[in-house]
Amino acid sequence: MSWEIEYTDAFEQWWNSLIEREQEAIDASVRLLEILGPSLKFPHSSGVNGSRHGRMRELRTQFGGRPLRTLYAFDPMRKAILLIGGDKTGNDRWYDEYAPMADDLYDEHLEELRKEGLLDGKEIF
């Protein structure tokens, strides 16, 4: 099974700021997510502490010794939503800064699904 992946404008903006080789490294991580879905485990993916959403995850990509992170979640439609990404090199507060942004983006995504009537009877996590 191939898992459907969507992304936010915030993720796209970050993606467009990357050089081609960084994009290729991120793309390799995203392809693993597409293939394995929620069963993608450490070291490629892990949970995110400090998120309001219990299912918030991160793709863990290394590029040239730098930890590039993509925060994502599976929505009630079982699609992976790439929310936001960044380089956490030397930033001990990266999760404190980015997890709330990812939470807000996921909340916006869920609200869009609600407006479209796609959440009727679906569990929100």
Question: Which residue stretches match the model-derived regions?
Answer:
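Basic, Lys/Arg-enriched alpha-helical interface segments
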Residues: 1-67, 76-80, 87-125
